[in-house]
A protein has these predicted regions:
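Active-site cofactor/cluster-binding pocket
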Residues: 1-168
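Non-catalytic terminal/interface segments that mediate subunit docking, oligomerization
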Residues: 143-200
């Protein structure tokens, strides 16, 4: 699995996106062309439509003039799923179904990701998206002893292995997850973690 996150250098707003490439073989970079675009707004579609493969699809709730569009009826789903904050998870459900990811595996991932309070809303939203379309691909499930780890977590683990016992930082992208990981392991690893008042 190779992920690439792109975000603008501003406190809030701007166009942000994540590109995910996965394979049963090792991958070392992303590719220019993509199989699927989940467009949460029209701007995303306009900026990335030229990167879509000929047999690719766009999943969006926006009114887009695109033959390959799979439309998410979020206005209807909103009436069933009372929490508007989880509507993005509808798109996640549609992606999982499109790639043929088993529902049971998806449920386990959602349980690991969300706390008990938000899990029920997110699983309801996920099911709405999952039931919207048919699978185009059928991924083979393989056991893999390798772990999935991001760069910041690898950096934090490396620092701990090298003997780091103090970490001081401010929760600001792109280093927020380093601070979060150190904080979550501080008691277990005997590390002093300090979050400073501001980024200066």
């Amino acid at each position: 699995v190779f992920t690439y996150r792109d975000y603008m250098s501003r406190v809030r707003g701007g166009h942000n996106f994540t590109q995910i490439r996965f394979s049963d073989k090792e991958v070392y970079s992303y590719r220019a062309k993509v199989d699927l675009i989940l467009a949460l707004n029209r701007e995303t579609y306009m900026l990335h439509r030229d990167r879509l493969k000929e047999d690719g699809v766009v999943i969006s709730h926006e009114e887009i003039s695109e033959e390959r569009l799979i439309r998410l009826p979020l206005d209807q789903i909103k009436k069933k799923v009372k929490n508007p904050k989880v509507l993005n998870t509808v798109g996640l459900g549609a992606i999982a179904k499109y790639f043929g990811i088993p529902f049971s595996i998806s449920v386990e991932v959602l349980k690991e990701t969300f706390n008990e309070r938000s899990y029920s809303d997110n699983i309801a939203a996920f099911m709405e998206g999952y039931n919207l379309l048919d699978s185009k691909h059928k991924l083979q499930i393989k056991e893999d002893r390798n772990i999935i780890i991001n760069g910041n977590k690898a950096l934090a683990l490396g620092a701990i292995a090298a003997g780091c016992r103090f970490y001081c930082g401010y929760p600001m992208t792109p280093s927020t997850s380093i601070l979060s990981y150190f904080s979550s392991r501080s008691n277990e690893m005997g590390i002093m973690v300090d979050q400073v008042e501001d980024e200066v």
